[in-house]
């Protein structure tokens, strides 16, 4: 199984028309013991399952939501990479994918 108590699952869940379906998926993850990191503008009490960490973002217009949700996701990626010892300023294989004219 891919999900167990050692696997954090980052969930981006704006409080919109798809929120209930996202909550259903989160409950499946929680039932399998996964650690849920919730990034949402909704109250974590609305989820109905245990959340390891809740990163709260402000409620904004749906057109601005991608910008608001991008910041915590970038910070999660940055801090995960530095924790793992990855040089975030010199990523591996970058020269192979970037061509200079």
Could you say what each language-model-derived stretch is?
Residues 1-101:
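A SIS-like phosphosugar-recognition module
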